[in-house]
Each structure stands twice: as C-alpha cells, then as structure tokens.
C-alpha cells in the first residue's frame, strides 16, 4: 500500500508515509 499510496498521493506521499508509519 505504501507504493500505491505514494503514487496516488504523489507530492503528499511523504506526509501520508509518516501518517501510515505512525
């Protein structure tokens, strides 16, 4: 989901990654 989320969000991938990781 990380890869897919990163691609879907794009620039917001970094923010989403931090939220998902936490």
From Swiss-Prot:
Q: Where is the signal peptide?
A: none
Does this entry carry the keyword Phosphoprotein? no
Any one GO MF term held by the record is: serine-type endopeptidase inhibitor activity
User: What UniProt keywords are attached to this protein's entry?
Assistant: Disulfide bond, Protease inhibitor, Serine protease inhibitor
Recorded family membership:
Belongs to the protease inhibitor I13 (potato type I serine protease inhibitor) family.
| Summary of the function given for this chain in its UniProt record | Inhibitor of chymotrypsin.
Q: Summarize subunit and interaction data from the UniProt record for this chain.
A: Heterodimer of an A chain and a B chain, linked by a disulfide bond.
Name used for this protein in its record: Cytin chain B
Q: Which organism is it from?
A: Theromyzon tessulatum (Duck leech)
